[in-house]
Regions:
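Generic hydrophobic alpha-helical segments
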Residues: 137-138, 257, 283, 324
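Single-stranded nucleic-acid-binding OB-fold domains
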Residues: 190, 224-229
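Alpha-helical interface subdomain recognition
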Residues: 1-92, 118-130, 262-405
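Glycine-rich flavin
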Residues: 36-197, 202-221
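Generic beta-structure capping elements
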Residues: 186, 216, 240-242, 379
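Short helix/loop capping segments that flank catalytic or ligand/cofactor-binding pockets
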Residues: 191-192, 221-222, 246-248, 277
Length: 405
């Protein structure tokens, strides 16, 4: 699906949208605008159901965003991280309450890493192996029918140590013949797990690895937690002798986890750009129509300078974010550097854009009825997601051999 001329080569990638990326962005923008946009999301925050299942059906199944990264032979779109970033920009601009990041990006990246470890996965008639189990789950996820979440705290940064909060503990009669292990422990602050039907759980013990767990299985419990970002509610997951199926162990599990976290950080940066651009656009539109002293407030030089500075920072951040997505798409050796740079820079730009949006809207920007606070809360939560700006700057310094003084 990707038609970027620089993808997969040594050439510098094109940081502008390709035709297919533009088409995806336009289609998704039109769909979300027709569904009511941020105003409908604001109304939804007052209900007990924060995630919009019908919207996810339209975005994930009808537009194919659930299977963007999944191969066409498995029912997906066969697209790349460039298309995923284009979709994330739009979803961020609408603060859409759908599990695209958690399921279509993070969990999918982990499963793709596992499935790629077995060259026989695509063959018909092969026995059920851990890698084939991962490939089978990808096929079920491709049309949005199954939503999967990686059971790690939202704040987990790429390169973090393998999670040890869940352990393999004991067994029950018959487990050995079914390949089931029993998991115990708790994971706090997990994003996009509330609407998930399947969990990918990193667990320590014997064997140390990545396990598939059915959310409806005995011994699995989820508890929503009060989240700053009401459009992406976090939850705590607990496992009490919950049955899990091993799909990757040892270094393969660690590689899958790191691939997922790296993809999550890179695509989250794209979401932050969509959010920042929407905050800028809303603010510019407002200061053009809001009048004080018989003139639009946007004509005042102080506001002009602040908006000009914001436009420059958003434009710079977009270039950094799209370079990171292009590196993820091509498997560039520069990927870790690009993602660390993008997440560090885009986090601060998004928060600044949301703060300026609230402040330049004046009194109305501080009210519950205006959606500006949704953008500020999403920006602040995203700035922690998959590593803070400081964590990514520290990682970047290590990657380029530039230690702190």
């Amino acid at each position: 699906m990707s038609d970027n001329p620089g993808a997969g080569t040594g050439a510098l990638p094109d940081l502008l949208y390709s035709d297919s990326e533009r088409a995806l962005s336009d289609s998704l923008t039109s769909l979300l605008a027709d569904r009511g946009g941020a105003d409908k999301t604001l109304a939804r925050t007052e209900s007990s159901q924060t995630y919009d299942d019908k919207l996810w059906q339209a975005v994930g199944a009808d537009l194919g965003c659930a299977g963007l990264l999944i191969a066409e032979r498995d029912g997906g779109a066969g697209a790349s991280y460039r298309e995923a970033a284009a979709a994330a920009e739009v979803l961020g601009s609408f603060v859409a309450p759908v599990p695209f990041l958690g399921s279509a990006v993070v969990a999918t990246a982990a499963l793709l890493s596992v499935a790629s470890s077995d060259p026989a996965v695509g063959s018909s008639g092969t026995p059920l192996t851990p890698a084939k189990a991962a490939a089978d789950l990808l096929r079920r996820m491709a049309d949005g029918g199954v939503t999967t979440a990686l059971a790690v705290p939202f704040a987990t940064a790429p390169g973090s140590a393998f999670a040890a909060s869940v352990r393999v503990a004991g067994s029950r009669p018959g487990d050995a013949t079914t390949g089931v292990a029993r998991l115990r422990g708790m994971v706090t602050g997990v994003a996009d797990a509330l609407p998930a039907s399947v969990l990918l759980v990193p667990a320590d013990g014997v064997p140390h690895g990545l396990y598939l767990v059915d959310m409806a299985a005995e011994g699995v419990a989820k508890a929503p937690v009060v989240s700053l970002d009401m459009t992406r509610q976090l939850c705590d997951l607990s496992f009490d002798d919950a049955p899990g199926t091993l799909i990757a162990s040892g270094s393969a599990a660690e590689q899958a986890l790191d691939a997922a976290l790296l993809a999550g950080a890179g695509i989250l940066a794209a979401e932050q750009i969509g959010l920042a651009q929407r905050c800028l656009d809303m603010t510019v539109a407002y200061v053009k129509e809001r009048r004080q002293f018989a003139r639009p407030v946007g004509s005042f030089q102080g506001l002009k300078h602040r908006l000009a500075d914001l436009w420059v920072s958003v434009t710079q951040a977009r270039a950094v974010s799209r370079y990171a997505a292009a590196c993820l798409a091509s498997g560039s050796p520069d990927t870790k550097v690009a993602v660390a740079l993008a997440k560090a820079y885009c986090s601060e730009v998004a928060v600044n854009a949301a703060q300026e949006c609230v402040q330049m809207h004046g009194g109305i920007g501080f009210t519950w009825e205006h959606p500006a606070h949704l953008y500020l809360k999403r920006a602040k939560a995203d700035s922690i997601g998959f590593g803070t700006a400081d964590a990514h700057r520290a990682a970047l310094a290590s990657l380029v051999n530039l230690p702190a003084p």
